[in-house]
């Protein structure tokens, strides 16, 4: 595969998504394509997969796979994207792997042996009849990988295949990739900003630069270390919020989503909630945030937090929304879920307006936050069009706009590159210095190291035999 | 509350041995008969035959039957009630109408309870030449439905976290509902686009003649099932004509 002076621009954008890229990859090579968000990594991968037709935007330079245009070579290319749920087509594991073979017109009697062998290759631990809906994220992604490998592609493209998985799931997928490409009959191109994890699996590292061009890193290259903020540990302040044997069971479910949990959230400290998927980390965040009522136990707010409430005796989930946002702020895993307006400026003013601030005061608060969080240049932009890192900063800023004493964040560093990671962690450290209590639900061990004073590691509930 | 429509693989039940297109064929046989018969006896005989098939579709306990048919029962009761209230023919016609609604819809329940969606898509594309793009595209889209249900919950909670809550004001409730629905639509379109790209990347509908790994065979029992549907309809009509109760709706 070969690119010379390649560039691409989406029709609605002014800036080039990628430009001046020269890259040559020989058959059997394993290449990691890295670089900060917005450098055009995914665009390049889509182009190689033959998914960027002339309708999608403007192209310059030359791009070939196997000496042909990527769209013509599509049958020789397998792709794995981020979200396993947006890639599985069938309801059973084996049927899904067979899907690509059927599309290629492979004779039915040759499909099932091929499916069996590729499932074994990626280390899929279940049979062909396993329901895809019952799989973990990591196993789903293994299945997607098997589906991409089944037609025996000459080129395998992986677009941040572990970005939506927990660390265990990511390991499952990387193991499967290592096994499946060990024989070197497939050329591999991985796009990921988590370079460190992929280094043992690749021969070359190429970094796309946001200003254009690509830099080849020599052997022995390591990504720059994460920038950790300097923190001065503070003594725990007064406890603001407390979970007392709080648990949650979904209606009709046999197993609780969260087993009875005790935890205290004191002012000026950061509590990290960790543990494997399915232990109820996000559920605990929703309970502490006053968004869901616990089905057992209770969430108790201290007088410091309930002062000024019309009914201070009520638990947080019974507070009115405008009373809630001035006391407990929540940042969801996907920022788009939270955006309600068409401009960054309005988005930041919304919380203060809702909780009774005047028009001037609300917009002053918005200005101040934009200034502090480096969003001032984007004041008029639509929140949905921002990059992942900018969206994340904006969602934290919207929660801060109403000056809550407690900030609950679900996977705040999810999908962030190293630069935005550093910015975000610094921003959160600042909140803690201001005396806010932080609750972080996270899989990211680095963020726990960087910020947490206390860690609550949730354990899987033993399944009764 | 269980949704009456299942989207995952269906555990095989005796009726699963009948090809989905044969079941659809049986529906096509029953449908016109029920549509034209305005009396009580004809739909009652058909309904009785359908009820006999419920155990074969794995609906053996009142609980499982109810779980699959509650919206249907509710609908039939509603139709009957409206007819009694506003119609001029009174109870008898209300009940006849309800029985017709049940007899019309129960074959659909049997089909859904006994048929794996994938097998249905296989049968439709192989026997009735339904375009694969439509059949498998729909299949893939159905998989997203439970994900969207979870997303709806999250968006609702995220709005409360932004201080947006309708309280008891119905207008505000309506606006919040519309806003949430719009956010969900955006999320659905985004997911759908990604799914379409992934399917394209796997060579779906690329102009090559698609094969089918599972196949779909029509056997003698499928013909027998269809013949059974014809026989039941004929018997129902014969019985109601013989007893003089048959009453075509268009007369």
Regions found by a protein language model. Give the residues of each.
Chain A
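ABC-family nucleotide-binding domains
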Residues: 159, 166, 417
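ABC ATPase C-loop
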Residues: 148-149, 399-400
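Conserved ABC ATPase signature
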Residues: 131-135, 139, 382-386, 390
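The feature captures the beta-strand-to-loop junction immediately N-terminal to the Walker
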Residues: 34-36, 274-276
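Helix-to-loop junction immediately C-terminal to a conserved catalytic motif
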Residues: 49, 289
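Catalytic Walker B motif of ABC-type/P-loop ATPase nucleotide-binding domains
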Residues: 156-160, 407-411
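Conserved ABC ATPase "signature" region
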Residues: 109-127, 360-378
